[in-house]
């Protein structure tokens, strides 16, 4: 267990050192590849979390993940900060379409499904995507353009 925490912390340090401390992000947010991220330890429903993110920063949404590297970053940050099994992401199914769409309007390109559903969270420990009823409460990560 100690080795896992040490390695996870090491990965977090590497990600943060690569991202720098860019001035484009609000205080308590961190910069990574042109976006600002912040983990919130305030359990909310998926819809309330998305609304909250949109109120925190211009262009803010629940986090969208577009690569394995970004998924790893989000998983490590969420687990290191929250140690929560439920961390909402901005992925949901639009009722009148058959396509999965991120809350920022981007189409799904990278996938890491554990199972199918309507609102998706990332398991912070295993970094897998799972589904839950959207009415459940979970912690969340917000993302906005830098």
UniProtKB/Swiss-Prot annotation:
Domain C-type lectin per the UniProt entry, residue ranges: 32-143
Pfam families: Lectin_C (PF00059)
Subcellular location: Secreted
Signal peptide extent: 1-23
Disulfides per UniProt: 25-36, 53-142, 119-134
Superkingdom of the source species: Eukaryota
Tissue: Expressed by the venom gland.
Functional description taken from the UniProt entry: Interferes with one step of hemostasis (modulation of platelet aggregation, or coagulation cascade, for example).
Family according to the record: Belongs to the snaclec family.
Protein known as: Snaclec 5
Annotated source species: Echis pyramidum leakeyi
